[in-house]
């Protein structure tokens, strides 16, 4: 059903290409997963390009849980342990311990502080001591192979940033409705029109990578 709804935004391949261009130009994109999975829409931004204003938008219209999607290589560079040793979450969402920039922030909660934390974490020469633990940014570990291995928003964020020629690090936040419920396909389309953010699905990305 979602593929029919999203056909107004082009073919699956076209939707991915439009999203990649948006990320290259510093805009966010909206990614919906499968209807039989979480059936949620996430805002995704390239970590290296996300602005304070975009972070404020994500905090205001999202769940408030700001996640930084990282590769295993980056997780090891920052020496971030996983949040739990035995992951029992339904979709094996791979949180590490939460983080905060060690310098340049106050409480760590503001949009500006969270951007500082993200920029600190993705620096080429970042070291573990650059970050305090815990904090107000939630790193997520992407699985090797991206969406071809796991059809999650975490993997979509890494795949999209890599395909866009950017650092493999993305920021995501689930989109919520005004009543606090999760935004589904029709609400995501309305949000897209309101905030000029292209829409695609994880299935689109799978099709793009499988060509």
Swiss-Prot record:
GO terms for cellular component: cytosol. The record marks 136, 174 as: Essential for catalytic activity. GO terms for biological process: riboflavin biosynthetic process. Keywords: Lyase, Magnesium, Manganese, Metal-binding, Riboflavin biosynthesis. Gene3D superfamilies: DHBP synthase. It comes from the Bacteria. It holds the Pfam family DHBP_synthase. Its cofactor is Mg(2+); Mn(2+). Its EC number is 4.1.99.12. This is 3,4-dihydroxy-2-butanone 4-phosphate synthase. It comes from Baumannia cicadellinicola subsp. Homalodisca coagulata. The lineage of its organism: Bacteria, Pseudomonadati, Pseudomonadota, Gammaproteobacteria, Candidatus Palibaumannia.
């Amino acid at each position: 059903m979602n593929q029919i709804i999203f056909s107004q935004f082009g073919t699956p391949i076209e939707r991915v290409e439009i999203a990649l261009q948006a990320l290259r130009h510093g805009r966010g994109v909206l990614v919906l997963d499968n209807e039989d999975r979480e059936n949620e829409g996430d805002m995704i931004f390239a970590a290296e390009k996300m602005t304070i204003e975009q972070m404020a938008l994500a905090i205001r219209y999202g769940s408030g849980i700001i996640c930084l999607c990282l590769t295993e290589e980056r997780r090891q560079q920052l020496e971030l342990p996983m949040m739990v040793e035995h992951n029992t979450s339904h979709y094996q969402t791979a949180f590490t311990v939460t983080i905060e920039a060690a310098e340049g922030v106050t409480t760590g909660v503001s949009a500006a502080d969270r951007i500082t934390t993200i920029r600190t974490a993705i620096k080429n020469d970042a070291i573990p001591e650059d970050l305090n633990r815990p904090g107000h940014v939630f790193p997520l570990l992407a699985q090797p192979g991206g969406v071809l291995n796991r059809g999650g928003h975490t993997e979509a964020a890494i795949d999209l940033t890599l395909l866009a020629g950017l650092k493999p690090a993305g920021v995501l936040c689930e989109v919520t409705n005004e009543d606090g419920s999760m935004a589904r396909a029709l609400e995501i389309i309305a949000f897209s029109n309101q905030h000029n953010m292209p829409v695609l699905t994880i299935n689109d990305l799978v099709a793009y990578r499988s060509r």
